């Protein structure tokens, strides 16, 4: 926390925020722990980067992605400054094995994700990541745009 405070205090961001990306193996690992971190850091220049796939680390979370997303936005919406877009798929390997996949090829509830994201500032970035080819990025973008169109959400 001291390091984050030090960075924010030194930079004194005016039009941006410093945010930590959630990862499955380190804190913050949930909406509640991210909220605790925001309170502990106690700086206006600290915000939230939301990557829902990075906090899906159990079958319980995997089968309830819509609930996880809605809970995260309800608790942290005003602090969210950008999001990552990808998808997740549970494989039949032992032990629990979760893979990142192209949006639309997994179980992430993009209807919930885009609905909640649409409630934020219209310039909140949604960035597709970790794909291998331009074609995969195009496929991902087409899927996300298709879901948004079904929901009548402009992108």
Regions found by a protein language model. Name each.
Residues 1-50:
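Active-site acidic/histidine proton-transfer and metal-coordination neighborhood
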Residues 13-14, 44, 79, 120, ...:
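Helix C-cap/helix->beta junction micro-motif
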Residues 26-46, 59-73, 137-145:
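Distinct, well-ordered alpha-helical segments
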Residues 18-20, 46-50, 81-84, 124-129:
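Hydrophobic faces of well-ordered beta-strands that scaffold small-molecule active sites
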Residues 117-155:
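C-terminal appended segment following the main domain
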């Amino acid at each position: 926390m001291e390091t984050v405070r030090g960075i924010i205090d030194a930079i004194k961001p005016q039009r941006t925020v410093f945010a930590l990306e959630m990862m499955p193996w380190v804190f913050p690992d949930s909406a509640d722990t991210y909220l605790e971190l925001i309170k502990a850091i106690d700086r206006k220049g600290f915000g939230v980067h939301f990557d829902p796939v990075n906090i899906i680390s159990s079958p319980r979370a995997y089968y309830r992605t819509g609930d996880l997303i809605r809970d995260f936005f309800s608790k942290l919406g005003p602090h969210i400054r950008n999001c990552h877009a990808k998808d997740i798929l549970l494989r039949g390997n032992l032990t629990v094995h979760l893979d990142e996949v192209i949006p639309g090829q997994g179980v992430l509830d993009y209807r919930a994700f885009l609905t909640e994201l649409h409630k934020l500032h219209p310039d909140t970035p949604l960035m597709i990541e970790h794909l291998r080819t331009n074609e995969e990025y195009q496929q991902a973008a087409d899927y996300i745009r298709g879901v948004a169109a079904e929901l009548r959400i402009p992108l």
